UniProtKB/Swiss-Prot annotation:
Top-level lineage group: Bacteria
Residue numbers spanned by region Disordered: 94-118
GO biological process: translation
Gene: rpsM
PROSITE patterns according to UniProt: RIBOSOMAL_S13_1, RIBOSOMAL_S13_2
HAMAP family found in the cross-reference section: Ribosomal_uS13
Source species of the chain: Cellvibrio japonicus (strain Ueda107) (Pseudomonas fluorescens subsp. cellulosa)
Subunit structure: Part of the 30S ribosomal subunit. Forms a loose heterodimer with protein S19. Forms two bridges to the 50S subunit in the 70S ribosome.
UniProt keyword annotation of Glycosyltransferase present: no
Family to which this protein belongs: Belongs to the universal ribosomal protein uS13 family.
GO molecular function, one term: structural constituent of ribosome
One Gene Ontology CC term in the entry: small ribosomal subunit
Function according to Swiss-Prot or TrEMBL: Located at the top of the head of the 30S subunit, it contacts several helices of the 16S rRNA. In the 70S ribosome it contacts the 23S rRNA (bridge B1a) and protein L5 of the 50S subunit (bridge B1b), connecting the 2 subunits; these bridges are implicated in subunit movement. Contacts the tRNAs in the A and P-sites.
Presence of the UniProt keyword Ribonucleoprotein in the record: yes
Protein name (record): Small ribosomal subunit protein uS13
């Protein structure tokens, strides 16, 4: 197994599919990385040379991935909450942010039902 951005990448899968194991790299970004490094998308990771793997690592290094991306997302949410804007308040209360109804639905964001105590 090859390691890219601190993640074990499966050797027996195509390059595009294997790159999606890295948090922050989807199919489109993986295709762009393959095109930039000159590697065919259907090439298996196990057959790549060390120079090609270094090229992929360098290209992935240009993107925000894994821990840095998670930290950036959390900091953006924290910033919204500190500002006290509408989206920040919705985050703070654990409710949907984008205008969905909450009278009957939104169970995913709100969590399980709480019984009414009498």
């Amino acid at each position: 197994m090859a390691r890219i951005a601190g993640v074990n990448i499966p050797d027996n899968k195509h390059a595009v599919i294997s790159l999606t194991y890295v948090y922050g790299i989807g199919r489109t970004t993986a295709k762009q990385i393959c095109a930039a490094t000159g590697i065919a998308e259907d090439t298996k990771i196990g057959t790549l040379s060390e120079e090609q793997m270094d090229a992929i690592r360098a290209e992935v290094g240009k993107h925000t991935v894994e821990g840095d991306l998670r930290r950036e997302i959390n900091m953006n949410i924290k910033r919204l909450m500190d500002l006290g804007c509408y989206r920040g308040l919705r985050h703070r209360r654990g409710l949907p942010l984008r205008g969905q109804r909450t009278k009957t639905n939104a169970r995913t964001r709100k969590g399980p039902r709480k019984p009414i105590k009498k």
